[in-house]
């Protein structure tokens, strides 16, 4: 948990620095939210809040659906996806929570499956 917190702090600092330099030495929170690098920050925060209990497919879903213009590294090129950006974050969160509510997903992870079987006895 401490390691994840350190990664979050480093990542947010790095993102702020990047956006500060891209926007001619001005930092705006809106530009941070629209940057591609912000997605990793959201992933780190979510993993930290959920105690690290996030399946790998949810991470892949985040990386796939969050970046419609994956070849672009510019914040300015990402502005046209502003509305989609929040919808895709919401979609990824919903998919993960629906998946975590299903009991059959425990059979995919052997440790969690054993814990699930022991708790039912």
UniProtKB/Swiss-Prot annotation:
Where in or outside the cell it occurs: the entry states: Membrane
Per UniProt, which keywords does this protein have?
Membrane, Transmembrane, Transmembrane helix
Q: Where are the transmembrane segments?
A: 2-22, 42-62, 89-109
State the superkingdom.
Eukaryota
An annotated GO cellular component: membrane
- How does it sit in the bilayer? Multi-pass membrane protein
As a miscellaneous remark, the entry gives: Partially overlaps PRM6.
- Descriptive protein name: Putative uncharacterized membrane protein YML047W-A
